[in-house]
A protein has these predicted regions:
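A gly/proline- and charged-residue-enriched helix-loop-helix capping module
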Residues: 80-98, 139-153
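Short beta-strand-loop/turn "lid" adjacent to the catalytic site in phosphate-handling enzymes
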Residues: 48-95, 109-112, 118-130
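Conserved active-site "lid/cap" helical segment
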Residues: 32-54, 84, 98-100
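Short glycine-rich, Thr/Ser-proximal phosphate-binding strand/loop in the N-terminal lobe
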Residues: 4-38, 197
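Glycine-rich phosphate-binding loop of actin/hexokinase-like ATP-binding domains
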Residues: 122-221
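Non-transmembrane, aqueous-exposed alpha-helical and coiled segments at domain scale
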Residues: 3-4, 93-97, 106-108, 182
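Short glycine-aspartate micro-motif
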Residues: 4-8, 55-57, 112, 172-176
């Protein structure tokens, strides 16, 4: 007997859901211009026709310093995820809104969050630590969290499979290239470095994000020099 689950990906502007029966997709829904204000009727109708679900899995961009792996969602976890909004303002509010909407629609179904930051929890301190006063690091929890982790984890496994290599004994660079973009160095199946950092703004040039900018450039602008 297969397990029927819902998989939820709340992006910055859209909400995507899949119903999986085992590994087989049986239904899908994409809501463009997804708003965090209220659950749209289409979502309720989709869930009503999804059949009996055994679990719901949510992709969440930021797990903070607390969550380095999947976690069952309860009120305390949801509140903590909401507190991370400033670190991922385009994505975190939409993910939290989707979680709350699905928990309201399916109060008896266990729901789990899987984090884009979790894959990067293996980055060694030498690569994850910023060259700033240690007091800042401790006070604000500064570290290279990294993002797109679910994508990088899959790409590394799939890339190794296609190359007929064991991912646990391979060195791979993975690329997530969309409106947001990042690279990741994967060694023996674990993330050891990535281009994104404390927030999803750092690293490569992206569609609406500048990527890394020399901080002196900002100072010179304020000083009237260009």
């Amino acid at each position: 007997m297969t397990t029927r689950i819902a998989v939820v990906n709340a992006g910055s502007s859209s909400l995507k859901l899949q119903i999986l029966d085992g590994s087989q997709e049986v239904a899908a829904l994409t809501l463009e211009r997804w708003s965090a204000d209220a659950a749209p009727e289409e979502l309720e109708e989709f869930i009503d026709t999804a059949g009996e679900l055994e679990a719901v899995g949510h992709r969440v961009v930021h797990g903070g310093s607390v969550h380095s792996g999947p976690v069952v969602l309860d009120d305390a976890v949801v509140d903590y995820l909401e507190s991370l909004t400033d670190l991922a303002p385009l994505h975190q509010p939409k993910a939290v809104a989707a979680i709350r909407a699905l928990r309201a629609l399916l109060p008896e179904v266990p729901q789990v969050a899987c984090f884009d930051t979790a894959f990067h929890s293996t980055i060694p301190a030498a690569n994850a630590t910023y060259a700033v006063p240690w007091e800042w690091t401790q006070r604000w929890g500064l570290r290279r969290y990294g993002f797109h982790g679910l994508s990088h984890a899959y790409a590394s496994r799939r890339g190794a499979e296609l190359a007929k290599r064991d991912v646990a004994d391979a060195r791979i660079v993975t690329c997530h290239l969309g409106a947001g973009a990042s690279l990741c160095a994967v060694r023996d199946g674990a993330s050891v470095d990535t281009t994104m950092g404390f927030t999803p703004l750092e690293g490569l040039v992206m569609a609406t994000r500048s990527g890394s900018v020399d901080p002196t450039r900002i100072a010179s602008e304020h000083a009237g020099s260009s």
